Amino acid sequence: MDFLPKEINDYCALYTQKEDDVLYQLHRETNQKILRPRMLSGHLQGQLLSFFSKMIQPDKILEIGTYTGYSAICLARGLKKGGELHTIDINEELEDFACSFIQKAGLKDCVKMHVGD
């Protein structure tokens, strides 16, 4: 997050849980293989989304803009048991990439991806 002062960013990084293996791999592969990797939510934003989702424990979430699935994974981890996250993206080229990481995260049953315009 380049918009935060370095001191605040460093503080957040120091006191935020480390990225798990799936999110780390997703972050890494997005930066290596995908055009415009800056669109990735990233670790600190993902942790904030996950925190809110776990606090609220929603039944349903609608995410507009899947990209490679990082934020979808973070949000879905806070769903109530049996809850669903519907994520919508226009880019068909990223569907398989995002779905593979959603599956690796063990969330394929609760994350429904919709692609197209």
Predicted regions and their residues:
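Beta-strand-loop-alpha "switch" segments that mediate conformational coupling across diverse proteins
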Residues: 26
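Conserved SAM-binding loop and adjacent beta-strand
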Residues: 17-18, 34-48
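S-adenosylmethionine/decaboxylated-SAM
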Residues: 43-117
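Conserved short-loop catalytic and cofactor-binding motifs
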Residues: 14, 36-37, 63, 86
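N-terminal auxiliary segments of SAM/dcSAM-dependent transferases
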Residues: 1-20
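Alpha-helix boundary/capping and short turn/kink residues
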Residues: 17-20, 35, 58, 84
